[in-house]
Design a protein with these regions (language model features):
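Flexible "arm" and connector segments at domain edges
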Residues: 2-122
């Protein structure tokens, strides 16, 4: 990890910018700093692709009954939960290592949910 990445991550941690559901335990913060931006990005991509596969498996196994799959409904749900957690952890780490402001994320989230509500006439 480059000096700028380290300084940025340390500054972000000192600012206490990660509250709420995006709080990382100290050991997670340290591990993320050791891995650096590139490895954190790669790990996030991998975990998100595994989440996509788990969502697809859940859809076929649970929602589209009768589709041949290698998992039982309980296994599909358990796998989906595990992949959700893996992706959430990586997203938290990515937010930290890139120094993304949580308030900005909340603002974007509000804009997107408001837009969806308008489109649905809610």
């Amino acid at each position: 990890m480059g000096v700028n990445e380290t300084q940025l991550a340390q500054k972000v941690i000192q600012m206490g910018a990660f509250t709420s559901v995006f709080t990382l335990k100290p050991e997670q913060q340290k591990a993320t700093l050791v891995l650096g931006q590139e490895e954190t990005l790669l790990q996030t991509m991998e975990e998100c692709s595994e989440l996509v596969a788990a969502c697809h498996q859940y859809r076929r196994t649970v929602l589209m009954k009768g589709q041949p799959t290698s998992k039982t409904p309980d296994e599909a749900i358990t796998n989906l939960k595990e992949e959700l957690v893996d992706a959430i952890i990586c997203i938290k780490e990515l937010i930290m290592i890139l120094g993304i402001d949580y308030d900005e994320l909340e603002k974007i989230e509000r804009e997107k949910t408001d837009r969806t509500a308008r489109r649905l006439g809610l």
